[in-house]
Structure formats: structure tokens, C-alpha cells
UniProtKB/Swiss-Prot annotation:
MF terms (GO), sorted A to Z: ATP binding; lipoate-protein ligase activity; lipoyltransferase activity
Name the record gives this protein: Lipoate-protein ligase A
InterPro entries: aa-tRNA-synth_II/BPL/LPL (IPR045864), BPL_LPL_catalytic (IPR004143), Lipoate_ligase_A (IPR023741), Lipoate_protein_ligase_C (IPR019491), LipoylTrfase_LipoateP_Ligase (IPR004562)
GO biological process: protein modification process
Task of the protein: Catalyzes both the ATP-dependent activation of exogenously supplied lipoate to lipoyl-AMP and the transfer of the activated lipoyl onto the lipoyl domains of lipoate-dependent enzymes.
Keyword Nucleotide-binding (UniProt): yes
Transmembrane segments: none
Localization of this protein: Cytoplasm
Organism whose genome encodes this protein: Escherichia coli O127:H6 (strain E2348/69 / EPEC)
Entry keyword annotation includes Cytoplasm: yes
Positions bound to ATP: 71, 76-79, 134
């Protein structure tokens, strides 16, 4: 029986693909070597210890239907579209070795007539007239008996959108968490205009087989039928949840301020695990009572636009004469925390 396993996803859903990856990693025998090939439609993928409000333009992502996905490995934030090819190599210890998987990807690129080299801990770069340019970034995860290396290759990604979603709004955010390092990148189509996702997957697969001296049939993973993976439904539910993607952010503070015709408002939030642990409101409004009441209501509230809006609008029952001010406040807060 082969010790290799090759899986190819036909889904572009980042939560589905990351849930598949997690399930395979947890249940694979320690003697198995796995290659998983996949890609995501418009998604910002953040590292396990990152703060999405710090890393991403969450408001623009929501407007453009770009998903947020938190992965289980460390590292920085990346934007995925269908111009990216994603790969995951898994193996049990002591055989797990990220230099092996890196060399497999380099061999695959070489077979496609792309001369690339490893740079730093995580990147693959190519030489261009403008200097070295990154075409691949990676992240890693290890447990006591196994490890994985996953990464992306930029084929024909819309690089302008990287800046759209990975440059966060200039919010007054004092946040802990790992900040992403921005690198100069290029697409492989700059070197090979006709290159496709299918060609890259085939090249990586062949390099994988060549390294281990074995071949195996590909398993196609599809959301049309629930994958036969232990605990997949629960893993997918967690991977797609707000609590995981946003709520796992490290503790941070957020300061919001705005001047309305009826007065200035300053809000101070402390947020832990996606919940407001402390809310302070300062205002020069002639009637501060609704804002003082709001501070009390927001304690323990989920740090989510719809929940904050709900708490603002709940005050209309007690302060109906200030409906105009409260609706303005509600709309502003909801926009400011997206």
C-alpha cells in the first residue's frame, strides 16, 4: 500500500478547504506523506495569531464580498483569488521536513522553466529586471508527531487587490498580534504568460511523485458530498464561524471619535476574544444620558457591527425623543467597526 496521498479540491471556498486540511492533518497516519492542492476565491487569509481589524480593510472586504479566513498556522495576512495556487505538504515526524517540500515546489517550477530560489524562512523568489520578486509565501504548523507546510504560488493574481484589502483603514487601534510584513511580489505569468493552475498542480504532483519514487491516484475533494473525514462538519462549522475568524483576535483597544451636529462623541473599547470587556463614552452633547446608557449596554457585547447597531437601536425605547441622534450614532458605529 502506498504511503502517499494526493488530494485535489474542486471547491473555491476557503473555509471548506482549510477544514479539509485540518481534518486530514489530524487523522492521517504518521507514516503517510500527503499533498493537498487547492485554491480560494476572493479571500483574505490571516495567521493564527493575527488581528483582522489591524491587518485588513474589513469594511472594504465586506463591501466587495471578500471572505476572511483564519488559518491554524502562524505568519502573516495574504489575499487569495483564483490567480493563486495553494499547496499543503504533510508528513509524520521525524520525516516531516519543510526543506523537502520546498525543494519539491522548486523542482516543479524548474520543470516549468521557472528558475526560483528559497529566500528567508518562508518565501520563493524569482529574478527580474527590477530585482528579486516574491512568487510564493509559506507558513508551517507542527505538533509533537507531525507537521505541515502550506503556501501559495502567485500565477495570475490581481495584485492591485492586495493593496485594497491588506492595507487597513487608519483606525485608532492599539492592537497586539503579529503584523504582516509586506513584500514585493510578481506573478508567474510575467515569466510564463500561458501558465495555468492545472499545469502548476500537475508539475507539483509529478515532483512529489518523483521525490518519493511512488505514484498514487488523486482523490477529488468536493463540497457536493460531505468529505469522508472524521469530524468534518464540526471542523467546517468552526472554520467558518465569526468566533474563529474574528473572535480569536488577540486583545486590543479601539478608539472611535466623530463630531455630529449635536455634539462630539468619543468611544473607547477594550476587546478580548471578540467581546467588548470595557466601554467608555465621552461626549459634549447637551443630553449625554443615552450615551452613558450605551456604555453600560456594550459591556460584554460581541464586537460586531450588527450587534453594536442593535444595542444602539435598543435605546430608542428609553430615549424616543433622541431618535435622530441615536440613529446617526448607530449608523456611524456600525460603519466604523466593520
Amino acid at each position: 500500500m502506498s504511503t502517499l496521498r494526493l488530494l485535489i479540491s474542486d471547491s473555491y471556498d476557503p473555509w471548506f478547504n482549510l477544514a479539509v486540511e485540518e481534518c486530514i492533518f489530524r487523522q492521517m497516519p504518521a507514516t503517510q506523506r500527503v499533498l493537498f492542492l487547492w485554491r480560494n476565491a476572493d479571500t483574505v487569509v490571516i495567521g493564527r495569531a493575527q488581528n483582522p481589524w489591524k491587518e485588513c480593510n474589513t469594511r472594504r472586504m465586506e463591501e466587495d464580498n471578500v471572505r476572511l479566513a483564519r488559518r491554524s498556522s502562524g505568519g502573516g495576512a495574504v489575499f487569495h483569488d483564483l490567480g493563486n495556487t495553494c499547496f499543503t505538504f504533510m508528513a509524520g515526524k521525524p520525516e516531516y521536513d519543510k526543506t523537502i517540500s520546498t525543494s519539491i515546489v522548486l523542482n516543479a517550477l524548474n520543470a516549468l522553466d521557472v528558475s526560483a530560489e528559497a529566500s528567508g524562512r518562508n518565501d520563493l523568489v524569482v529574478k527580474t529586471a527590477e530585482g528579486d520578486r516574491k512568487v510564493s509565501g509559506s507558513a508551517y504548523r507542527e505538533t509533537k508527531d507531525r507537521g505541515f507546510h502550506h503556501g501559495t504560488l502567485l500565477l495570475n493574481a490581481d495584485l492591485s487587490r492586495l493593496a485594497n484589502y491588506l492595507n487597513p483603514d487608519k483606525k485608532k487601534l492599539a492592537a497586539k498580534g503579529i503584523t504582516s510584513v509586506r513584500s514585493r511580489v510578481t506573478n508567474l505569468t510575467e515569466l510564463l504568460p500561458e501558465i495555468t493552475h492545472e499545469q502548476v498542480c500537475e508539475a507539483i504532483t509529478e515532483a512529489f511523485f518523483a521525490h518519493y519514487g511512488e505514484r498514487v491516484e488523486a482523490e477529488i475533494i468536493s463540497p457536493d458530498k460531505t468529505p469522508d473525514l472524521p469530524n468534518f462538519a464540526e471542523t467546517f462549522a468552526r472554520q467558518s464561524s465569526w468566533e474563529w475568524n474574528f473572535g480569536q483576535a488577540p486583545a486590543f483597544s479601539h478608539l472611535l471619535d466623530e463630531r455630529f451636529t449635536w455634539g462630539g462623541v468619543e468611544l473607547h473599547f477594550d476587546v478580548e476574544k471578540g467581546h467588548i470587556t470595557r466601554a467608555q463614552v465621552f461626549t459634549d452633547s447637551l443630553n449625554p444620558a443615552p450615551l452613558e446608557a450605551l456604555a453600560g449596554r456594550l459591556q460584554g457585547c460581541l464586537y460586531r457591527a450588527d450587534m453594536l447597531q442593535q444595542e444602539c437601536e435598543a435605546l430608542l425605547v428609553d430615549f424616543p425623543e433622541q431618535e435622530k441622534e441615536l440613529r446617526e450614532l448607530s449608523t456611524w458605529i456600525a460603519g466604523a467597526v466593520r
